[in-house]
């Protein structure tokens, strides 16, 4: 079987990229990773306003996205290691009153599964695992465990679960273990202000309240591996979360709890020969800034733009010029957000009194500096980036 693009991995990023390429008339195959998590996860994603605008061009019923709560404000606080008053900072977008939306991952996946089911030229393989690729010739040949093989002009790797395949890439990765577990807690309840997300930084780790429907929200708390919170029962954890967030939220009731190991990974290049990286394998960052999927959507939109533009002037869709331009154009943004969140998590969760005092002064300064806050919001919402495509 021959395709224009073959994906290994069927996560949200892969499905978004596949739909985008299919709508440009390309023939696409998705090989589903057997280790990928079920759609029943309670995880949520913050989608910036720019990402939402892009995604609504890809799906038949964009109203499905618009039903979720619009986030108009993000309030952050930094606890004082000495126990005195917290420092606060508020981010808003005064031009549009919208920073983005928080949407459950399973809803996003369902939207793009539905879109894939409506499109032609899509093949989904569920019972195979690629074990080797040969991308040194004009096309890429992908060899399966079953000894079958398929060919494509471009192989897109969006799964990080196949160590053997990753080793064969001519790409270096930067890795870091946060020694943290993310507690993803689905709750019933509301914040004190409608359309406002909250994040609190303390020595226990960053905790965020992320509302996505009128009376439903997610609490994400990144705690150390050895924290007693990891094994705490629902009732006791509910009491602690309510105490932690009582200045931001009305009483919250826990529905369910999931736990995820947090690790950092950053690819120094986004391609190797005719293999392209998209999604978490390209940059798996701390959830502290809520930018993980937004970075991937920026990657996807630019990659598809380059493929379309180069093809229109006679280049093959696996031309090295496409891959080089894609890598160079996305380098700065991906590096800044990936390593910026790595440093930010270390600084804001520290128990060092001097670092905490300096951080508090920095937050106090930033709260008073509307110009700096405007720059931050402009970058986080991504609207300028998507408008430039």
Residue ranges and their predicted role:
Residues 1, 57, 68-168, 176-181:
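Conserved N-terminal helical subregion
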Residues 4-6, 10-72, 106:
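Glycine-rich FAD cofactor-binding loop and adjacent beta-loop-alpha segment at the N-terminus
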Residues 46-49, 93-114, 228-235, 262, ...:
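Short beta-strand to alpha-helix junction loop
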Residues 55, 154-250, 254-257:
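Conserved FAD-binding catalytic core of PHBH/FMO-like flavoproteins
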Residues 229-313, 317-321:
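FAD/FMN-dependent oxidoreductases across multiple families
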Residues 305-389:
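C-terminal helical "tail/cap" subdomain of flavin- and related membrane-associated enzymes
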């Amino acid at each position: 079987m021959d395709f224009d693009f073959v994906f290994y991995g069927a996560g949200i990023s892969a499905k978004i990229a596949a739909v985008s390429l299919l709508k440009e008339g390309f023939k696409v195959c998705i090989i589903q990773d057997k280790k990928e998590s079920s759609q029943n996860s309670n995880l949520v994603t913050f989608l910036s306003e720019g990402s939402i605008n892009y995604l609504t061009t890809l799906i038949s019923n964009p109203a499905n996205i618009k039903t979720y709560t619009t986030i108009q404000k993000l309030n952050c606080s930094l606890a004082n290691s000495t126990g005195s008053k917290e420092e606060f900072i508020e981010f808003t977008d005064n031009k549009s009153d919208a920073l983005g939306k928080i949407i459950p991952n399973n809803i996003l996946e369902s939207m793009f599964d539905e879109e894939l089911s409506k499109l032609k030229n899509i093949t989904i393989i569920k019972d195979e695992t690629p074990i080797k690729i040969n991308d040194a010739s004009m096309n890429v040949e992908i060899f399966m465990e079953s000894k079958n093989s398929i060919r494509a002009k471009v192989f897109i790797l969006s799964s990080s679960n196949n160590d053997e395949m990753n080793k064969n890439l001519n790409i270096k990765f930067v890795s870091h273990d946060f020694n943290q577990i993310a507690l993803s807690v689905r709750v019933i309840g509301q914040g004190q202000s409608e359309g406002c997300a909250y994040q609190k930084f303390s020595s226990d780790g960053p905790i965020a309240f992320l509302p996505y429907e009128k009376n439903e929200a997610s609490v994400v708390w990144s705690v150390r591996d050895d924290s007693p919170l990891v094994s705490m029962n629902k009732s006791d954890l509910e009491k602690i979360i309510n105490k932690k967030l009582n200045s931001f939220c009305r009483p919250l009731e826990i529905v369910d709890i999931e736990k995820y190991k947090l690790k950092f990974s950053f690819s120094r290049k986004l391609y190797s020969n005719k293999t392209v990286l998209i999604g978490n394998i390209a940059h798996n960052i701390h959830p502290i800034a809520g930018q993980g999927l937004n970075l991937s959507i920026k990657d996807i939109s630019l990659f598809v733009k380059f493929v379309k533009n180069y093809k229109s002037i006679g280049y093959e869709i696996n031309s090295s010029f496409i891959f080089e331009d894609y890598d160079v154009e996305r380098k700065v943004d991906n590096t800044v957000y990936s390593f910026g969140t790595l440093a930010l998590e270390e600084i804001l969760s520290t128990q060092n009194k001097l670092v905490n005092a300096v951080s508090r002064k920095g937050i106090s300064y930033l709260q008073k500096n509307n110009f700096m806050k405007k720059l931050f919001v402009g970058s986080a919402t991504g609207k300028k980036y998507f408008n430039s495509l």
